[in-house]
């Protein structure tokens, strides 16, 4: 039995939401989109992420969400994404979110280089999730 039924009045077509983002990415010639806002994660995954989390959306194919390792299994269970597309990071060398996501993104890019879209802005709501200056600098240096 399918997990979702398109005839259900509460059905939300999450794969189509991803395709819509990918269509917009193509218009802007983006190879990867790095989402960090709480609303973006919920809107694309159908899961709640109480910890710092990110979603990497490639130009084609399924996105991958990254969250704190202790919450990854629960987030994967809540999401329409399978467990191979909801990964955990940990505050240890090589397993922190910047290192893990950077390596993941580089594998998606031809020759490890490409155009990456990020979420940027400001909000009065603290957990909004825009990239912090620290995260932006670390990602920029790691992906340069």
Residue ranges and their predicted role:
Residues 1-144:
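A composition/biophysics-driven feature that prefers long, compositionally simple stretches
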